């Protein structure tokens, strides 16, 4: 009997090794975390300390290097390369593309950290070394969420877009992107190892984002509806909502994703406009935002290369290096999506568009929400921070 037509295409076959090995390890880890929470937390803390204290400089070098590489690619002849055929036209309108670009890097944690990240720095000795909370507490949030993080995404997005739309590779795997370097070894152990590491990185990023989203939503529900909701119940609710959104996106493809992205943009910027116009801190938000942005640009290279070699505060190890590692983890997923939706656009448009939509929207979010809460704290209108703030 001829079974030729029953065989699945190569890119649609299930890779059981990549599926079962991470699943097994995750189940084992979950059991260990549940049975030995204190010991597990101690081990994870030691691993994080080792990576930040011993290998932290490499994260900083890679972060700055990738950002500079993105600028070079966008301004060089390689920026003219079209991600697609010679006469390929963009698949999505400029607004739809930009909305999906921004929401590719948007999660619940941006709402949490836009509003409150300055609180985490307020009592840090490093801020006192630099100057005052007023001057520096709102600078680092912008730095940690803007140019270098999106540089990680956009360099890889250009590479993946070239792989998908120019080389016409259908397997959206990290190993496939490494085929020019690995050659025949892509389909062997080396390629499998790369894909396994990518899966573990994606799981780690998802877990981190999920751990931030759950308490944020619990607090919001408690404040809005005065209902104390158990974290386990909230987790189930989030999973159900996630399944609904995923199913909608699956049934409607990128058209559905585009619709959800635009709806998210309208809601998000509607919130920002409401806070700016009716929050009572418009003047403070604008003036402090301009000052913070200018200070970040003026001191960009110093912020990007500060290592605290004597460990007087360990600020870069605790924060900057942690963030760079966090963004690197999400490079497993976001660049593939950005590269996919950028079909028909040039490499230059992809990179600069990412900085315009992604970085621009992120900075606006941190300026409005962060300076709103900081202004309320400094004026005494609200006790948001864990410690009193001084000018």
Question: Predicted segment positions?
Answer:
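Hydrophobic alpha-helical segments and their helix-loop junctions in multi-pass secondary transporters
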Residues: 28-40, 63-80, 207-224, 236, ...
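Hydrophobic transmembrane alpha-helices that form the core helical bundles
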Residues: 34, 38, 102-123, 150-167, ...
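Selective recognition of specific alpha-helical transmembrane segments in multi-pass small-molecule
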Residues: 100-109, 152-156, 199-207, 235-250, ...
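Transmembrane alpha-helical segments of multi-pass small-molecule transport proteins
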Residues: 21-35, 60-68, 225-251, 270, ...
């Amino acid at each position: 009997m001829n079974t030729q037509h029953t065989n699945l295409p190569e890119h649609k076959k299930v890779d059981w090794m990549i599926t079962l090995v991470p699943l097994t390890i995750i189940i084992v880890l979950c059991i260990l975390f549940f049975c030995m929470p204190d010991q597990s937390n101690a081990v994870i803390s030691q691993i994080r300390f080792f990576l930040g204290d011993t290998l932290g400089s490499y994260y900083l070098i890679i972060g700055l290097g990738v950002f500079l590489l993105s600028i070079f690619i966008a301004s060089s002849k390689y920026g003219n390369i079209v991600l697609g055929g010679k006469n390929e036209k963009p698949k999505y309108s400029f607004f739809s593309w930009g909305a999906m670009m921004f929401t590719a890097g948007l999660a619940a944690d941006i709402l949490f950290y836009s509003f409150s990240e300055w609180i985490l720095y307020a009592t840090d000795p490093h801020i006192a070394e630099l100057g005052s909370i007023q001057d520096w507490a709102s600078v680092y949030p912008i730095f940690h969420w803007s140019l270098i993080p999106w540089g990680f995404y956009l360099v890889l997005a250009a590479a993946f877009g070239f792989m998908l739309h120019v080389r016409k590779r259908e397997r959206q795997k990290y190993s496939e992107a490494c085929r020019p370097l690995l050659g025949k070894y892509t389909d062997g152990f080396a390629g499998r190892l790369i894909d396994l590491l990518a899966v573990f990185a994606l799981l780690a990023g998802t877990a981190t984002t999920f751990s931030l989203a759950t308490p944020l939503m619990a607090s919001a529900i408690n404040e809005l509806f005065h209902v104390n909701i158990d974290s386990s119940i909230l987790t189930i609710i989030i999973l159900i909502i996630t399944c609904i959104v995923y199913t909608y996106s699956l049934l409607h493809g990128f058209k559905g994703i585009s619709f959800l992205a635009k709806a998210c943009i309208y809601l998000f910027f509607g919130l920002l406009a409401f806070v700016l116009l009716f929050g009572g801190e418009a003047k403070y938000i604008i003036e402090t935002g301009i000052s913070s942005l200018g200070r970040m640009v003026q001191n960009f290279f110093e912020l990007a290369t500060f290592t605290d070699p004597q460990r007087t505060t360990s600020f870069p190890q605790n924060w900057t290096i942690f963030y760079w590692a966090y963004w690197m983890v999400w490079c497993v997923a976001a660049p593939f999506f950005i590269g996919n939706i950028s079909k028909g656009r040039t490499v230059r448009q992809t990179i600069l568009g990412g900085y315009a939509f992604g970085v621009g929207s992120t900075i606006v979010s941190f300026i409005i929400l962060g300076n709103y809460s900081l202004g309320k704290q400094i004026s005494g209108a609200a006790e948001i921070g864990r410690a009193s703030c001084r000018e």
